[in-house]
């Protein structure tokens, strides 16, 4: 069979699609995968042929579009960000029409799901969405809030999303010869019976599966999808770890950090206060600029699967993939969140009693030392190991997701053949 995967975002958003694509390819299927231009080398190095799809993520971050949306009280930044959203939609619509031609199923992520849903409707093929956090309306996403309020917040978010995307979506549907949409893309996706794979562990959101029981097998939980690729630095880092006490890992993925130099200095000082070593991952462009300390090792990339279990604790931005890696590693976690869905994971880490969370911009040397002191208490390590034993295994998650896509596509092919008889 032929599968088209359309991914957008940073490595944390793209890697699950690459992991799924590799498994489908291993099973003998034809896989076409579109990724942001800056992710092409990464996906191809994993063993997949990829094409450019959508905006360059690093250029997006360099324009600081994230901060434009945070400056909601100013008019021009949101307008500029909206223009960028519409241009990205138009570009993706053009690219995807050719990428999905002849496919038996097309799959994407949540943010630009409407682009892909329209193309799937045009070709009359099944459609799937990978969810890295509970994005559909539910009452469980923020455990500290009442269920009705959680549902109201998510419903408002999706209505706002539709209003923002309505103009480029209308243009795309005209181009495809489809009727004008009169309801939210989320409603249309659900109505079409799309496969919405929840690529995180069910235990992170207790009660969610029961709340979504009406959707049957259309919202299955499989766990995080990852390639678990090794890096050239892994052996050296593991040797450094073995030569002393287990360090605390710090890394913030692709998130924009205003001053890497100040951040490294803050981390070094907080760890020195506690008598701890630090392993800090920085972007390659910052490697030569950040300060050096005897109790700190600076790296540009490590395998989370290889290194996290050897650390005393993990501090990160709260991306879904990194959160899953720290939970699977069985070590306490501190999430210093930066953007949109990351506070959700901070709240779940706290609810699971395996760590704590705080907004990155509100973090100081004193607060960091205090948060680390909290999560380094023995009960957090004990609880983290307990949770790790209940987490899905990476290979099981990828296999389960591939099984679901095969089943969805094959059932549609069988139905199509029957209708043609």
From Swiss-Prot:
Any Gene Ontology biological process: lipid glycosylation
EC code = 2.4.-.-
InterPro entries in UniProt: EryCIII-like_C, Glycosyltransferase_28, GlycoTrans_28_N, UDP_glucos_trans
On the tree of life, the source organism's domain of life is Bacteria
SUPFAM superfamilies named among the record's database cross-references: UDP-Glycosyltransferase/glycogen phosphorylase
What Pfam family is a match, any one?
Answer: Glyco_transf_28
Q: Which UniProt keywords apply?
A: Glycosyltransferase, Transferase
One example GO MF annotation: UDP-glycosyltransferase activity
Top EC class, one word: transferase
PANTHER family, from UniProt? STEROL 3-BETA-GLUCOSYLTRANSFERASE, STEROL 3-BETA-GLUCOSYLTRANSFERASE UGT80A2
In which family does this protein belong, per the annotation?
Belongs to the glycosyltransferase 28 family.
Q: What is the protein's given name?
A: Uncharacterized glycosyltransferase ML2348
Biological source species: Mycobacterium leprae (strain TN)
